Amino acid sequence: MKRKFILFLAFMAASVAVMAQNPLPNDPEVKVGKLENGLTYYIRHNDKPAQRAEFYLATNVGAFQETDEQDGLAHFLEHMCFNGTKNFPGKDLLNWLQSIGAEFGRNINASTGFEETQYMLNNIPIVREGIVDSCLLALHDYSHFVSCLPEEIDAERGVILEERRTRRDANWRMFEKALPYYYGDTPYAKRTLIGSEEQLKNFEYHCLTDFYRKWYNPDMQAVVVVGDVDVNQIEEKIRKTFSDIPAPAVPTEKVMYPIPANEEPIVAVLTDPEATGSNISILWKMDPLPEQMNNTDVAYMLSLAKYQIQLIMSERFSDITSQPDSPFLGAGFGIGNLCETCDAASGNVSFKPGMAKEAFSAFMIQIEKMKKIWFH
């Protein structure tokens, strides 16, 4: 049975039921708009520090949108954005950004997740207008005009294979083994973010470009600019720079798969010869808050409750860990999302050698206390 791990949130259920689901007011200092092609933008002035700005492209797509032949290519595509675009061939973009004092990794970066990909130009010194124009042009090219030249793809294979080699330590390998237990028989269980060695060595070029053309469309993207800028001027620049990106003839639907319920607890023992410690991970699956309730006062109240739960449990487990007879080395508790279709409360216990049963029991006693007596 898919358990509803209500926790302290149940204490607030009566209030939630009678509250009007009023939308939270937007920050009046944030200018929000949408171009005809579907691209959304957010702009806010912030002059601390002066003459600095942040530029982001958020894309509502990640590894979960890959097909089997595209495993790892959402992340691979992120790398290709730094290897040649329409207006910045080869390494021109990186070279230019470094020429104005930006550093790769610190000011220039990107991140690929299971359900989203973000490109960031952070803390950029905007000492002249042309720098703003070029940063927006870089996001424009990431959005729809990455070159993905065969020779650049082949050159990047080795880079990502080395990243994979260093990333896949014992914890990562056990995480990959755990995916089917988290996500059941859904496509989510097959996605590893970085892909297999064989896949990275041998995928055909079109697999990467097919993913890019299908998913990197303006209706799936947002541009964010925050910094010491004139908001109206930035809005005009965004409209001028991004309006040439074509809207898809048929918008691509982002399919989301429900995580199957289970009648009995799912138990797995996962090992790795290079593991340096032992721990117990526990998940309680929950239905997510309905999308229409996001950005409402109810959602905000629940987020505060979750934060307080996690804070209280963190302090409680810290106190227990500090005791000399504690069966575990550390423990944690959190409430978040497993994917867009499933939220989860999660616990993690690192236990002393030979004390798995005692550590699990001590952890669950605290969970039951939390549920039954509301932290008193």
Predicted features, each with a name:
Residues 1-22:
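Bacterial Sec-dependent N-terminal signal peptides
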Residues 103-107, 283, 310-350:
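A structural supersecondary motif
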Residues 222-278, 374:
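An aromatic/glycine/proline-enriched structural segment found at the starts
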